[in-house]
Amino acid sequence: MISLIEKAPYIPYPLALYEKLEQRHTLLFESAEIESKAHTKSLLMAKACLKLVCNHNIVTITSLTPNGGAFLQTLSAFFKTPIQDNALTLTYTKDKKIQDEFLKLFEPSPFDALRGLFKSVKTRPKHPFTLFSAGVFSFEMLNFFEDLPHLKANDNTANDFIFYVAQNLIIIDHKEKSAEILGACFDERFKTEIAKELQDLKELVKNIKSDFIPKKAKQSIEVSVSCDDSEFEKKVLFLQEEIKKGEIFQAVLSRSFYMECLEGLSAYYHLKLSNPSPYMFYIKDSDFILFGASPESALKYNALTNTAEIYPIAGTRLRGKDKQGNIDYDLDSKMEFDLQHDYKERAEHIMLVDLARNDMARVSKKRYCDKLLKVDKYSNVMHLVSRVVGELKKGCDSLHAYRSFMNAGTLSGAPKISAIKLIYQLENQRRGSYGGSVGYLNSEGSMDSCITIRSCFVKNNRAVIQAGAGIVLDSVPQNEANETRAKVQALIDAIRKTIS
């Protein structure tokens, strides 16, 4: 593999740049600091050369460009599998004889297809993003590893995972005010062509002088919901009975809100403007659009330090606002104090921090928790947060850590598998991207991902916005229903701002 790197002028308008490049199999990842809300970094996949799709135990790898076809040939040799119809099809079977929880992490799985991307090629020159793969893990990715029922499809039709390999990647560092463009070349024959693509991108960057201008469209403002408050509250009561029986301690029950969405990119613009978050993303597939502003890290792994971290978020309050909808700082401080000293919220949060520590223990030599019970604030809500860090055991990589963590206790419950079985019973349909993760893997071996919450899945101009609430014995059913509405409000507002 040959890596091409071009320095480019700094551009403070990543969304305006993405608008010029928006097509199928592209994505934009952005990040903002929680405290200052200042933007820190943007990653823009301008062109993908491969697409990987997982459906339960089958992974299909398809080339999207001639250069991707060359990489597919390399992968064919690596996996010892022939190419048919411009694609590789890999099938994985669980080894049910393995009982040891640590050894189970190393059984064959669809994650091996992602590992193969990086094991099959040697990168030169060395750059952390020489080879870059990014995409989505669904909530139901867990079903391959655990004995869980298969559910009917939801409007959120995201596969178990969908990942792309970048042919052209633009990296913008907003702190350093720098930019670079990377090209991944898998055959000498395509070097000149990819070098030209990088020069064209460089010219495009130079010519963008102003920010993205959002568009509007005529569409309905109506919002519908998968289950109304009354039905949701009955499900809360059912879970509380299961808690009394000792089946679970906590479960995260969710519901979906639906509305029309004709201008996804403009809705994303309004969302990130009102709700700058550590993880902001816009993904355009051939089948759907997924965008969001997630406050919660799924798994962050630094290959250089061999450390993984999880950022549990559990415990929510509305922001303190006046009648005009502006932040009332005295009221906001009272809400923050109330959240930090609420026995129910603290107990729920500590339980999920303990679950995160247990997940980390499976793959780490040592671990610790810092930032315990800190408060992060967003446009409509504030959350209790903590950070769990661990140094991975020998032989473990980012995907072993993700497997151990999947799915986040803050989106499932405790004990995790028992809670998920009850969630499946009550929700009775796939969550798809909701509660899974969005993230990337790079050639350094590092991974960064967020839990797919505060997100919107759009297919055929229909938006699915899903949100959940953590149910414990002390939960007040109406309050939990209200919490789901509070969590989706920023997305509903963002879409409504695109309506003419």
Curated annotation (Swiss-Prot):
Record: residues binding chorismate: G315, T316, Y434, R454, G468, A469, G470
Which pathway is recorded for this entry?
Answer: Amino-acid biosynthesis; L-tryptophan biosynthesis; L-tryptophan from chorismate: step 1/5
- Where Mg(2+) binds, per the record, is at E348, E483
Kindly state a single biological-process term from the GO annotations of this entry.
L-tryptophan biosynthetic process
The similarity comment for this entry is: Belongs to the anthranilate synthase component I family.
Describe the protein's quaternary organization and the partners it interacts with: Heterotetramer consisting of two non-identical subunits: a beta subunit (TrpG) and a large alpha subunit (TrpE).
Name recorded for this polypeptide: Anthranilate synthase component 1
* Species whose genome carries this gene: Helicobacter pylori (strain J99 / ATCC 700824)
